[in-house]
């Protein structure tokens, strides 16, 4: 597939594609700086209390607690779960649709090979297949689930694959730390069905993906 830098093969450092050079996208020097900005620009207590319904607040809060795995597994793989999971999904979906990114900004994520393969439309084996990974450069992929991200590199989970996400202003999602059942994760949560453009992939010496650079473009709902 195309995309800037997408026609080149894996170089000596294991890089396919290119890291976007977009200086206007917000990055923060520290987690404290990121938290202060997002509390002022990506969350609003009045909006939370009065614009969202009880079901929407419950859905988002449930995701930040113990239900995130069941909700995303059901959405991404179609696996049935507890009866109340669909209620949480519906509430979180409609609630997050009422929030948008306030500025072009960068967020971060760590994910395992399983969910990275799911996002890229492949198998875990293909996460070490150079031809398959190269074919993803420039492609638009959709996360059928909710995507948890950190607002600073220090708050991103450590996992098999490091994600850097350039989020365009107006993408559906919210800074959930003020209302989270796991405060201190400093999480920005993207709504389900967000579209991402693949800009860069980095692999290790064995050819396995270890880094993914995405651009969050819009939400398909």
Where are these regions (language model features)?
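Hydrophobic, gly/ala-rich membrane-insertion helices/peptides used by toxins and envelope proteins
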Residues: 1-3
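Mono-ADP-ribosyltransferase
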Residues: 6-221
